[in-house]
Design a protein with these regions (language model features):
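A short beta-loop-alpha structural element at the N-terminal edge
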Residues: 3-17
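Conserved beta-strand in the GNAT
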Residues: 53, 59-68
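A short helix-loop-beta-strand connector motif used in the catalytic cores of GNAT acetyltransferases and
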Residues: 41-53, 80
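Conserved GNAT-fold acetyl-CoA-binding loop/helix
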Residues: 16-41
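Conserved GNAT acetyl-CoA-binding A-motif
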Residues: 100, 107-118
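Conserved beta-strand-loop-alpha-helix junction that forms the acyl-donor binding cleft
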Residues: 113-126, 144-149
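Glycine-rich acetyl-CoA-binding "A-motif" of GNAT/NAT acetyltransferases
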Residues: 48, 59-62, 125
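Conserved acetyl-CoA-binding loop-helix of GNAT-fold acetyltransferases
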Residues: 86, 92-105, 132
């Protein structure tokens, strides 16, 4: 039985609290109100994708966000694991693997042909999990250009 379920508005406080810690770990600026707005957008608009939460009893201990898109290269619908986070207290219990299974099942049901994700280079455990689950590095760059002004948006670091 899955420990994941579709997120609802009542889960936003827990998701945002976890997100804040995760962003701080990686040195990104975090704005609570922006995170809440984004979470509610994904919860309330199924055309954007899905947000799932992992629960231990009544407590949210993780989440995975899947955003939908389109690609000629991937012959139609594609999706992106925008975020996958498991609380440190619950890591090593198979929840990351289960989060990917939930995301993949949702994507197959939604007619998605390819599922993408990005991972911080220093997160070796996550890289290992993703590779074991069949994700491959296509030796490409993920590049971003912000189209809306934001003082708080994550910014790339200089590469060496």
């Amino acid at each position: 039985m899955s420990r994941f379920r579709r997120a609802g508005p009542g889960d936003v406080d827990a998701i945002v609290a976890m997100m804040c810690g995760y962003y701080q770990e990686d040195g990104y600026t975090f704005v609570d109100s922006e995170a809440r707005t984004a979470a509610l957008m994904l919860i309330n608009d199924p055309s954007l994708g899905r947000l799932f939460v992992a629960c231990d009893g009544a407590h949210v201990v993780g989440y995975v966000a899947v955003a939908l898109g389109f690609s000629f290269e991937y012959r139609g619908r594609e999706a992106f694991v925008d975020e996958l986070l498991i609380a440190e207290s619950h890591r090593g219990r198979g929840l990351g693997r289960e989060a990917l299974e939930v995301a993949e099942t949702y994507c197959r049901e939604a007619g998605v042909n390819a599922l993408h994700l990005e991972v911080e280079r220093h997160r070796e455990n996550a890289l290992d999990l993703y590779r074991r689950r069949g994700f491959a590095d296509f030796n490409r760059y993920l590049m971003t250009k912000w189209l809306t002004p934001s003082k708080t948006a994550p910014r790339p670091t200089a590469s060496t």
